[in-house]
Structures are given as C-alpha cells and as structure tokens.
C-alpha cells in the first residue's frame, strides 16, 4: 500500500487569514501537509519528521518585542524552509537580518522583478514581453526586510520593496514577501510546486485513490470486527464517511438517518434511495418530525431553536444507538477545518492532529470509541473522494445547507405548515436556477419563510397569505459575500411560479443584502 504520509510538509501558522489556503495548495499539488501553531516544540517537529517547512504570514510586526518567532530548530532541522510574508520577515530576523516598518505599505497587486532565477522561481515568468522575468503577485504587508542574513541573495524586488524575495540555496532557505497561496498571484501554485516537489523532493502521492486506500486500511485496523454507528444526514461529509466505512467493514456499519421534518423537499426519500438502494448500506430511517416540532413549539429565538434541534437529535440518535447493543464505535464526519477551528477556539492556535480527538463533544453517557476517517481532509478533498467512491457530482456540489435545516430558514416559531410551504417554494427556486444555468454561478441560494402575511390578488378574489424571500449570494470563502445579480426575467419567472403553484404564499421578495452587514443565513 502507498504510504501517503511518507513525504509531508509542516506549515507553521503565524495567524494569517490565508494560512489554510497554503495547506490546500500543497494538498492540491499532491503532497500531505499539516497546519500547526508557530510555537511548537522541537520534539513535536522531530516526531512529525517533515520533508519541508513553510512559515505562514501573520498580522503581527517583527519590529515588536514580543512578536512570534519560529522555533530555532526549524533552521537546524536540515530541511528546506519557505517563509511567506511575515514568515520571510521572521526568517530574516532570526538568521541575522533586519526588518523595519515600511513607509509605503503594499496591499493588493504588485509586479515583482526577478533578480535571480533560483530553484524557487525556475521557469516562472508572468510577463514574457519584458526584458527581465516578472511575477504578478498579491502583497499584504506593512514591514519589510532591509538587510539580508548572511548567505542570502536578493531574488525579487518591487519599486517600494527592495527585498521582495530572498534565498540561501546552500541551506535551501527561501523567502517571499508576497502570497503565492492566493489565486491573485498568477504563478503561485507553480512556485509552491517548485518548493514542495523540486526543492523538498516530495513525491505526489496524495491522490483520491491513495487516500481512500489508506482510510479503508486505517478503519479496518482501528475497529477490526466491531460494529460502528453513524448519523447519516445526506450531507457531503457524512455521506463520504458512510461510503468509506461501508467499503472497510460492510454490514458492520449501522447508519441512522434522522428525518427531523426540517429537510428539503423529498430529501428523506432521496437519501434512502441513494444509500439504501443504490449503495446497499445498512440504514435505519427514523421519522422524528413530530418529536422535533413538538419540542420547538413556542420557541422563536434563533439560538434557542438551534440548541433545541441539536438536543432532540442527540436524544433520538441515542435512543436508536441503545437498540444496537453490539455497537462499540461512533463514526463522525469531522473534517480538518473542524479540527483546526476546535483547537483555535480553545487555545487561539491551530494544533497538531491528535487521533481520537472528539471535536463535536460526545455526551458523557455515550461510551463509544470515535472513528473520524475524514479528519485530515479539507472540504474540496472530501468532494474528490466522494466522486471517486461513486457519489454523483450534483450531490457533492450542492449549495451549503445548515445543520438545523429549515429550522433557521423559517423565521420565528417553526410550524409544519410553514415548513411545507417553504419546501415547495425553495424547490421551485432551485429548479429554475438549474434550468437557467445559474445554480453553479452562485455560491449559495435558498428561500426564507417570513412569518408575515401580505395581500394579493388571485383571479377575481383577494388573498391574504404568507411572504417568502429568495436569497442568492456570490462568495469565495463565505466570510464576505455579495448578493447575486440574477436576471430580472428569471426572478420574475420564479416569483410567478411560487405564487401560482404554492397555495399559501402571496408575495415573493429578493434579498439584496451583502455580508457584511447582513449574514448569509437570516438566522
């Protein structure tokens, strides 16, 4: 079996908003990497045994007395090191150079003139018409290196940054003041490939097929002949987790699908058809709609609704798990960003992956071992694995759907009538987006039920029914978002269909709020 962790890159996080992008780019190249806090110990680095190290950017200033520094062992480990932005500055400072706050801060696009073609910049040139090679890059820095450490040479400059890139090829140390991990840097992926593959010598073994093979082997080793229970929602993470476990242990996997009455139109039937009929999984469907709706009566505050939905789910799932007396393991679809965010919420830092770490917080009374086959993977990697396992692309690439489901898309108190109306209206919205080839042009689209009534006219009669709002946004990272400028004729068609086909809705509005100031979801 291929050892997909044999060659690996260690990324030390100094707090940049782009740090996870570095890891995703390295994985995209085909090499495993992990993201750790900047203040790891020498012992931890030795144990990880990286093939190369990348120092991320960060918001601090190296000119400040207590600003973060890389562990000294980083520069004594005998492996290549790449410093990005702040990572380059701390490398320079720690190896004997100088940095200072720049009079001309650089934020946004810049053109770097390459002064020397070292291994990092081999075959890179974004401007073939210029006499000297240039790179179009993305800058985001206020400090700059003003004196090189001994043994380094300048490899790139800009008009306001005399040391925009540097290298000491004898020690395989490299620094760039720009961000190769962002797509705005045209040749950024090629530069990172030069470092990871060309300089570090990593083999590209991190592929979907190899990841599946490794995950299946590790599941078999962990659980043996024991039985495992999994809460299957039909979402990407739990679906891929289910198929990996099914491939590893077959009928020893028990999937529990809790139909809470807060799902999209026909979603429960689709989950059963996909995983029960097509893939042959051992799946139990629990119709718990009444239980959820009863618990939600009289609750209109969003956070209280979320907590109630979460508690009822745990209670329902626990009831089912007690019926399966031979189960010894609980599987979860935890992914790598969950691990990073969980660690950060507790310590303010990203931490080392630790096996059997319970990100979600199991109730104390559920005495089960934990299986998390996706905990090393980013979302885009999970989707690639899902495709390789046979899941349809349209399912894997669906827009995000909140954990509480329609519970946070029905504003105020949740009632079955409201959910039924919303399901039908939302299905029409999504259907028309697909027909008009707009579904994949927007990042997320959904319908919100507003608990207010509005006067309308239907034929010769007057109607007084509910209002729904359409929401469609465009975003890269979901941290900020713009409302999608859908064509007026498309919006008109969607509105007309909803009002005419969904008895109980008299008015359709379109949400044109950005994030910020609004959030993407209404609750």
Curated annotation (Swiss-Prot):
Keywords in alphabetical order: ATP-binding, Glutamine amidotransferase, GMP biosynthesis, Ligase, Nucleotide-binding, Purine biosynthesis
UniProt keyword ATP-binding present: yes
UniProt EC number: 6.3.5.2
InterPro entries tied to this protein: Class_I_gatase-like, GATASE, GMP_synth_C, GMP_synth_GATase, GMP_synthase, GMPS_ATP_PPase_dom, NAD/GMP_synthase, Rossmann-like_a/b/a_fold
GO MF term set: ATP binding; GMP synthase activity
Pfam family, one: GMP_synt_C
Protein name from the UniProt record: GMP synthase [glutamine-hydrolyzing]
Organism of provenance: Actinobacillus pleuropneumoniae serotype 3 (strain JL03)
